[in-house]
Amino acid sequence: MHCAHERICRRATYLCRGIFAYGTPVQTARQTLAQIGASWRATATATAEVREDILDILRLQNPYVETTGFDRGNLFFAVKKPVDKYKELVSYLKEKGYDTSGDSGIIYCLTRKSVEQVSFDLRNEGFSVTRYHAGLSDEERKENQENFIYGKRQIMVATNAFGMGIDKPDVRFVIHYNMPKNMESYYQEAGRAWRDGEPSECILYYEPKDVRTNRLFIENGEENSELDEETRKIVKERDLERLKQMTFYCFTSECLRQYILNYFGEKSSSYCGNCLNCQTQFEEVDITLEANTILRCLDALDWNYGAATVIDIVHGGKSQKILGKNLDKNPEYAVLSERTVP
């Protein structure tokens, strides 16, 4: 397009998806973007829903929208559920030689407290570590960030406050020490390991309390305090749904890359060969008998018992609780006494 008398302004607003990902009030978002006066917006990780939200906020008429591929083929994805997460982390770093090599990596933690603890412990292990979170002074954050970018420190331990605008090409791994609250955040942060196109690893350590912590953040919703009550409710429901999708990612036995790409609306192969699930052989087991027995056992109970109690019933347990509450009279008692129920 050639316009002799018209100046075309092209500015990329970094991560437009943040408009809705963080619950920014619509009017505030419109005012902010209007002040920028840009004619070109860009975002790296937006679902179809978020793209529609962005177009609505900008009030664009007949906009040209181009969606490129989300796949980052050089990234290896893995989800692990270690019993001792810190021990697993140290073992990984030493196995890969990050205690002696000059390669860089990022470890994301959910809270400032975790950042402080992990960075302190790794430093004591002899790793070249720095840290970043909103609780540090501006001066210290700037110094720590520059030490990481320019190679004075190899490992950055940080909350999600770190990363905006960072384009360090030689990041070889991104480890999520805790599960983030949504797939958008996860993929954005994991993508900081792919900038030079070389093979890199993205590992997520899952533990159940991550779900509770994220739910607490969502329930509190301090960043949504400017919204009216009805909008806050909508935002909270949306955020809880995204948390659920993030949790599903941690438990799927399917290709992790396929799960990610499908989440962002992109079709992909069911086998990528470059994620832990694709490199793991899952055995297909028929558990119809076990499932039906447990369901019938639950139907026969007149009270809500925990999973451990139900397992004891179908296994034929003889504990004081089972016998004292006459749970041995359940029609499914001991039906699975010879079977293993996880």
Model-derived regions: residue spans:
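C-terminal accessory regions
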Residues: 239-267
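Accessory DNA-binding and partner-docking regions appended to nucleic-acid-acting proteins
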Residues: 213, 224-228, 238-239, 258, ...
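Short helix-to-turn junction characteristic of helix-turn-helix DNA-binding domains
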Residues: 93, 148, 250, 298-302
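Pre-recognition alpha-helix immediately N-terminal to the DNA-recognition helix
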Residues: 25, 88, 245, 293-296
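Catalytic cores of large soluble enzymes that bind and process phosphate-bearing ligands
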Residues: 42-46, 81, 136, 234-238, ...
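Helicase motor core with emphasis on the C-terminal RecA-like subdomain
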Residues: 1-230, 241, 266-270, 277
